[in-house]
Amino acid sequence: SDEAWTKTLEQIEIFQREILEKNREMKQIKKWNDIHTLKENEIGAVLTLEGAESFGNDFTKLEQLYDFGVLSIGLTWNNANLCADGVGELRGAGLTSLGKEVIIENNKRKVLTDVSHLSEKSFWDTLEIADYVFASHSNAKTICPHPRNLSDEQLKALFQKGGHIHLVFYPTFVKMNEKKVSIGHLVDHIDHICSLGGLHHIGFGSDFDGIDEFVQGLENAAKYPYFIEQLLKYYSEEHVRRFAYKNFLSFISSVHP
């Protein structure tokens, strides 16, 4: 819709004004291999999109988003739209013809396709088409049976495709019906994902900007050093480095070899 497009442009303008212009160490990553050009103390910032409502069926708008530097697109939030059904849509349909066309454009542009909010049918449809696929903020459904999490079958297929899962820190997606969700509960997800062959496919997606409840000790991004410190009690330094950044760098290197 026009309203969604206007809001998208407003958010991009805020990103440019508040993130890039006011923080000299922040550099926009407009293609994935720009990460390798960052200098010491510089931080890369990436524009991503959740929900295709902003461009609808207008591929001119989609092209503009690519030109602005959007490098990851999730077709839906939890609801359905012109591209796909989200995980909250009860009918559980998959990608539309339009959604498939958008993914093909993502492939051409080396833009990631994000499956975190898709219905299960949309997930499987996406895996058939997308060259660069990941779940930006999801967990393991076997450990926490929330619809937003991925089943063992989905995770194995994602890894087989070369895709990644970035863990989400929203307590309800980590441990359902638990008043005090801890880092130990997140470790349960990491252990399980590793047992499925995901050691080289795990990252952290957090979702700090989208949640108002928190894992104890992970209330904001400033707690990442503490989180890493805690993970080192469970895993080797090499494995923790993989989870924190090495896996993702390897992933994007496969997008831009």
PLM features: residue spans?
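Outer-membrane beta-barrel pore domains
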Residues: 177-180, 211-218, 231-234
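Extended, charged catalytic domains and RNA/DNA-binding interfaces, predominantly
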Residues: 1-168, 172-174, 187, 191-194, ...
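Residues that line or immediately flank small-molecule/substrate-binding pockets and catalytic motifs
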Residues: 77, 206, 247
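Mid-to-C-terminal alpha-helical segments outside catalytic/metal-binding sites
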Residues: 219-257
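Short acidic/histidine-rich active-site segments
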Residues: 168, 197-218
